[in-house]
From Swiss-Prot:
Keyword Transmembrane helix: yes
Superkingdom to which the source organism belongs: Bacteria
Signal peptide: 1-29
Gene coding for it: yvsG
Species: Bacillus subtilis (strain 168)
Name of the featured protein: Uncharacterized protein YvsG
Top-level taxonomy: Bacteria, Bacillati, Bacillota, Bacilli, Bacillales
Transmembrane feature ranges: 67-87, 137-157
Membrane topology annotation: Multi-pass membrane protein
Keywords, in A-Z order: Cell membrane, Membrane, Signal, Transmembrane, Transmembrane helix
Any single GO CC term annotated in Swiss-Prot or TrEMBL for this entry: plasma membrane
Length: 160
């Protein structure tokens, strides 16, 4: 998936969580957008990889793309880091939900992810798509609509 789809996936997931669980919607959406980019630190040409080129190059060299940073092990480590060092639960939850949305979206691609890293088994959802394809554009549109819906519901109440 492309960076914009990951960002919208993080925002959509976090606005839904804010709606259903009472989190702050603005903090959740912002941290979800950031969290949705974090797993791609392993890709030097990703949005986050270009912002942190040295870290990205190191992670990419050591692990490769869609391996460690796209795994449950990485999520567990990030959970301990965020819950220990980020006191605001809106932000820590948003980061984690954003990262989880990233893994789900990348598992929806042709190559899938190594969710059980260090195992070499790739996990891919049964219906999958090519990154940057028309199918991804439809997913992006759906995530955008979901985000708009939840933002509306959060700030204006019932829709119908």
């Amino acid at each position: 998936m492309t960076g914009k789809t990951h960002i919208m996936g993080g925002i959509a997931s976090c606005t839904a969580a804010a709606y259903y669980y009472g989190f702050d919607p603005v903090l959740m959406a912002a941290s979800g957008a950031v969290g949705a980019l974090i797993p791609d630190i392993c890709h030097t040409q990703s949005k986050i990889g270009r912002k942190f080129p040295i870290l990205s190059k190191v992670v990419s060299s050591v692990f490769g793309h869609r391996t460690f940073t796209h795994s449950l092990l990485f999520m567990l480590i990030m959970f301990f880091i965020t819950s220990t060092y980020i006191p605001d639960k809106n932000i820590s939850a948003g980061l984690m939900i954003g990262m989880a949305s990233h893994l789900i979206l990348d598992a929806w691609t042709v190559n899938g992810i190594k969710l059980l890293f260090p195992s070499t088994i790739r996990v891919r959802l049964p219906l999958y798509m090519k990154t940057g394809s028309f199918s991804e554009q439809l997913v992006l549109a759906g995530l955008t609509l979901a985000s708009c819906y939840y933002f509306y519901m959060l700030f204006h109440g019932r829709m119908f």
